[in-house]
UniProtKB/Swiss-Prot annotation:
This is Matrix extracellular phosphoglycoprotein. The gene is MEPE. GO terms for molecular function: extracellular matrix protein binding; extracellular matrix structural constituent. Phosphorylated on serine residues in the ASARM motif (in vitro) by FAM20C; the phosphorylation is important for the inhibition of bone mineralization. It holds the Pfam family Osteoregulin. The lineage of its organism: Eukaryota, Metazoa, Chordata, Craniata, Vertebrata. One of its GO terms (biological process) is biomineral tissue development. The acidic serine aspartate-rich MEPE-associated (ASARM) motif is sufficient when phosphorylated to inhibit bone mineralization by osteoblasts and cartilage mineralization by chondrocytes by binding hydroxyapatite crystals during the mineralization stage. It can also inhibit dentin mineralization. It comes from Homo sapiens (Human).
Length: 525
């Protein structure tokens, strides 16, 4: 078996040998062909690269040649331009030198001519002219020397043009200065010296004038401010007397009986003072049964307010004492309706001279008019005494410290408690006008005011207070509203009726008349 197997293997090998030989030959031939193709490709690639290199070298050479040609053309052009420029420069130099020589000749001749006619300056003109004539000979000789020098430069060789130009540059300022005669320089310098002090004096005077004019203008404005004339109606729009009283700041206008002094009433429409932000407008009036009177402004305290509790721990008399310490305060009551102003004042205790006091019997004099009093400010001792007198004398006028918890036995007490309200009230005038604030000053001594019944729009009223006050506007009262106290008669308001006068009231009025007065005032408003 083994021999048989070995024989089969040998037979297969011998049979398969001729079949393998041609395949090997084919493979050899294919390899040779591939090698040849690769060699051809390499040769082609090499030729291609060589062609590219040759082409690149040729193109670079051509570019270099073109650039060289351009450079040559540019250099030639620049050389041509330079030659033309040099030629032009040379010709321009020649022209400039010629013109300069001619101008020098003309300048020298002009200088000689000008020296014959020198300028005179003021009073020293004759002296300057004599100096110029005495120096004329020297100037003529100098001008002739200049002409000789310029002629020598012109007749010189061409090679000396540059040197001549430099010398001309150096000589031009000297020639110009030398052409002008010295006498003229002296005259001009002297005239400038004369003009300078004049200008300096004017410059010194001008700020003085401006300061003086500024001060004069300030004084004029101040005098105008002091001498403003304010027109005040002599009555409150309805008594039939339409004349206007004009006054300055220090004049005294007519007075309506014995009542309180009033501030400016500009007629219709606008308020006199600029203090417009903190002013209250009182529009409603409460009856005796209501707790408080209405007001529109919530920024500052109202007109008829009674402080519940002061920050200092004191009552309204203390606040009156504080407001009385303001040196320029004014007590003003402005009524523009049929409201009633009344009260009683002890005229013997009022500050000021006796000649300026108002008697208690002269209540019916000057009805419906307004008077301004300007007394000297009372001293601090008088103020303290006045505040203590007010605390002692107004026993029925006292206001409790805690206003919310207080009650009154009758309407009479509520009527009597309006004394401190009357001095801190402001009243809006007709239209959009608002009354000025009323700080208490002298009324804190013994003001005892009451409100009486309101009989109608045509009821005649008389002012019963007389006093002298300083006129200083724009004061604000510091009172706050007492919500627990009835405001039946302390409220003030506007009445649209034509007849507006003031009447005095008495202390012993009944509570019924006060109720009717407060209701009629609230209805009229």
């Amino acid at each position: 078996m083994r021999v048989f197997c070995v024989g089969l293997l040998l037979f297969s090998v011998t049979w398969a040998a001729p079949t393998f030989q041609p395949q090997t030959e084919k493979t050899k031939q294919s390899c040779v062909e591939e090698q040849r193709q690769e060699e051809k490709n390499k040769d082609n690639i090499g030729f291609h690269h060589l062609g590219k290199r040759i082409n690149q070298e040729l193109s670079s050479k051509e570019n270099i040649v073109q650039e060289r040609k351009k450079d040559l053309s540019l250099s030639e052009a620049s050389e041509n331009k330079g030659s033309s420029k040099s030629q032009n420069y040379f010709t321009n130099r020649q022209r400039l030198n010629k013109e300069y020589s001619i101008s020098n000749k003309e300048n020298t001749h002009n200088g000689l001519r000008m020296s014959i006619y020198p300028k005179s300056t003021g009073n020293k003109g004759f002296e300057d002219g004599d100096d110029a004539i005495s120096k004329l000979h020297d100037q003529e000789e100098y001008g002739a020397a200049l002409i000789r020098n310029n002629m020598q430069h012109i007749m010189g060789p061409v090679t000396a043009i540059k040197l001549l130009g430099e010398e001309n540059k150096e000589n031009t300022p000297r020639n110009v200065l030398n052409i002008i005669p010295a006498s003229m320089n002296y005259a001009k310098a002297h005239s400038k010296d004369k003009k300078k002090p004049q200008r300096d004096s004017q410059a010194q005077k001008s700020p003085v004038k401006s300061k003086s004019t500024h001060r004069i203008q300030h004084n004029i404005d101040y005098l105008k401010h002091l001498s403003k004339v304010k027109k005040i109606p002599s009555d409150f729009e309805g008594s039939g007397y339409t004349d206007l009283q004009e006054r300055g700041d220090n004049d005294i206008s007519p007075f309506s009986g014995d009542g309180q002094p009033f501030k400016d009433i500009p007629g219709k429409g606008e308020a006199t003072g600029p203090d417009l932000e903190g002013k209250d407008i009182q529009t409603g009036f409460a009856g005796p049964s209501e707790a408080e009177s209405t007001h529109l402004d919530t920024k500052k305290p109202g007109y008829n307010e009674i402080p519940e509790r002061e920050e200092n721990g004191g009552n309204t008399i203390g606040t009156r004492d504080e407001t009385a310490k303001e040196a320029d305060a004014v007590d003003v009551s402005l009524v523009e309706g049929s409201n009633d102003i009344m009260g009683s004042t002890n005229f013997k205790e009022l500050p000021g001279r006796e000649g300026n006091r108002v008697d208690a019997g002269s209540q019916n004099a000057h009805q419906g008019k307004v008077e301004f009093h300007y007394p000297p400010a009372p001293s601090k001792e008088k103020r303290k005494e006045g505040s203590s007198d007010a605390a002692e004398s107004t026993n029925y006028n006292e206001i409790p410290k805690n206003g919310k918890g207080s009650t009154r036995k009758g309407v009479d007490h509520s009527n009597r408690n309006q004394a401190t309200l009357n001095e801190k009230q402001r009243f809006p005038s007709k239209g959009k006008s608002q009354g000025l604030p009323i700080p208490s000053r002298g009324l804190d001594n013994e003001i005892k005011n009451e409100m009486d019944s309101f009989n109608g729009p045509s009821h005649e009223n008389i002012i019963t207070h007389g006093r002298k006050y300083h006129y200083v506007p724009h004061r604000q009262n510091n009172s706050t509203r007492n919500k627990g106290m009835p405001q039946g008669k302390g409220s003030w308001g506007r009445q649209p009726h034509s007849n507006r006068r003031f009447s005095s009231r008495r202390r012993d009025d009944s509570s019924e008349s006060s109720d009717s007065g407060s209701s009629s005032e609230s209805d009229g408003d």
